[in-house]
Amino acid sequence: MTTLKAPELLLPAGSLDKMRAAYDFGADAIYAGQPRYSLRARNNEFKLEQIGIGIAEAHQRGKKFFVTSNLLPHNDKVRTYMRDIEPVIAMKPDGLIMADPGLIMMVREKWPEVPIHLSVQANTVNWAAVKFWQQVGVTRIILSRELSLDEIEKIRQECPDMELEVFVHGALCIAYSGRCLLSGYFNRRDPNQGTCTNACRWSYGTQASATDPNTGEAMAVPMDTDFDFAKSQQEAEQTFSACGDGQRHPEADKIYLLEEKGRPGQLMPIMEDEHGTYIMNSKDLRAVEYVDRLTKIGVDSLKVEGRTKSLYYVSRTAQVYRRAIDDAVAGRPFNPELISELDGLANRGYTAGLMDRRPANDYQNYETGHSVGHRSQFVGEVRAVADGWAEIETKNKFSVGDRIEIIHPSGNRIV
């Protein structure tokens, strides 16, 4: 009987406390980066001093610490990057996560001994691209989230000597593996410089349009007109022209049909609430049920997204995915309780993404831009225990009579 190799469990860390929690709850490695050069410029406590402390603690515990440098730099950051990464490399991180070919070339030339992991930002979707990067000297590929399980398996078969990393949990981007321009367009904040404002999560109002019979120009159709979105353009114009009584008619409904010009006839219903509509809001990735398959494929590392998430998020995801990996290696069947434990985290609804090629509307949450989970609320962190008393740093309100789950590396209990 062949013994399966356990994939590395890789967790995010936005602070030293979150790094320690990730290790305590089962992570083999964490990733963190300098705010200026990673894609998390906000809510990121890892300055140079913290990176040094983190790397030292990781190695003392037999764990790994990867430094994220996956921005796509403009000219002014190329020179400063090489200057600022030098003291980081002197601290002996276990690898750099990078996306830009130019920076990869420069790091390889100056520090050829440093392992380079190719970021998901590089959009690696086939085995030929993996071989290309292998020839360049990259030691691990973080595969694009757009791949199915079968495609991942094919890459493993064609590239048996390359380390492969796959995202299994966390936020998904509407754009192709994070290459999004929305934030730059609306706020002049470049997502690929680490300053994404998550414009895809905002609510967007919609209005129908019709041609002004006098000018021939497009004009908005007020919601109090008798406008049927299923009618042809000609019928819509006639309806708009004929209706001027200012009354909202029964057949008018706040249900819109969105049609992409390149796919005529494929209508997508858009629901609007009092805040707007959410046509770009992706659900969150949850692939815990596929850990067994990914382990059998031979994926080297399973990654959780979320450097800006809470300590509770880091602890829970580390604990759940650790159990899933251990079960897969031991040959135990998948435990559905792991899904319910992840359901308690704040989330936008879950999807397995493109791993199992579900219908397209399974990936998006059109109803709301806010969390649809959050059945559990993070109420506090135990900071110290002495003489039977616990010092708790409160994060949210809780009251006498509330059921509180205490999660601990040795086991959870409800009090």
Name what the model sees in each region.
Residues 102-103:
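Alpha-helix capping/helix-boundary segments
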Residues 126-128:
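Conserved nucleotide-cofactor-binding alpha/beta core module
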Residues 106:
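Basic, amphipathic alpha-helical recognition segments used for DNA target recognition
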Residues 40-57:
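Glycine-rich, positively charged N-terminal anion/phosphate-binding segment
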Residues 2-25, 29-36, 55, 61-85, ...:
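Surface-exposed amphipathic alpha-helical tracts and adjacent flexible/coil segments at the periphery
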